[in-house]
Regions:
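Short, structurally constrained coil/turn elements
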Residues: 7-9, 77, 136
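A conserved beta-strand/loop element that lines the FAD pocket in flavoprotein oxidoreductases
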Residues: 7-22
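Hydrophobic/aromatic-lined pockets within catalytic cores
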Residues: 8, 12, 37, 42, ...
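C-terminal lid/capping helical subdomain adjacent to the catalytic/cofactor pocket in oxidative enzymes
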Residues: 17-18, 30, 51-62, 69-70, ...
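Mid-domain catalytic core of redox enzymes
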Residues: 19, 23-129, 133
Length: 185
């Protein structure tokens, strides 16, 4: 989208791919906004929090596949949770063929990419250890789904990112300390 393009092309932003954050990197910046997994930030010192991950299956089709960009599947009889047909994200373009992806959700293992936090009552003690430690941090703010360990839809994620930017700019202007979380966790 134009919003993402303007962010990644901004002169003050450098995008680095396939590079994991390390604690040593914190000294390179005045303030860090961390959107990775909260437990991973602390090298899972207290244990791993629970996440769901996704596997994707690509479908190539020489026609229209489902007639819309995203179709969610909530039936226990269907093994995937969603199909995304990307050509519908840009309806002004004409495409003969279509590329779709089926999304399969499963429990996240140690080497998987976490997508969705799984907050469970029986795991709150573990989460609270990480939250308590994070709230004591200086010069870092935990953001997004993984950083705040909450399920968030994208519209809420973007709204919270904008709110966090406002809080940060206000803290700079008023010379106040930026909190570790700008939302209730």
């Amino acid at each position: 989208t134009q919003m993402v393009k303007s962010i990644v092309e901004h002169e003050n932003i450098t995008v680095e791919l396939c590079r994991s954050f390390t604690q040593k990197m914190r000294t390179d910046y005045d303030h860090v906004f961390f959107s990775g997994a909260l437990d991973a930030f602390y090298s899972c010192q207290y244990g791993r929090l629970e996440y769901r991950t996704l596997d994707f299956k690509k479908i190539l089709c020489q026609r229209d596949y489902q007639g819309c960009a995203v179709m969610n599947y909530c039936s226990i009889d269907i093994p995937y949770t969603r199909i995304t047909e990307h050509k519908y994200f840009s309806p002004w373009e004409q495409h003969e063929a279509s590329i779709c992806y089926q999304e399969y959700s499963r429990e996240c293992e140690a080497d998987d990419i976490p997508y969705y936090p799984v907050r469970r009552a029986d795991k709150m003690d573990l989460l609270n250890k990480y939250l308590s430690r994070a709230k004591k941090e200086k010069n870092i703010t935990f953001i997004g789904r993984l950083g705040t360990y909450r399920y968030l839809d994208m519209d809420i994620t973007i709204a919270e990112a904008l709110q966090t930017a406002d809080v940060y700019l206000t803290s700079l202007y008023e010379q106040k300390e930026m909190p570790a979380f700008t939302v209730t966790v």
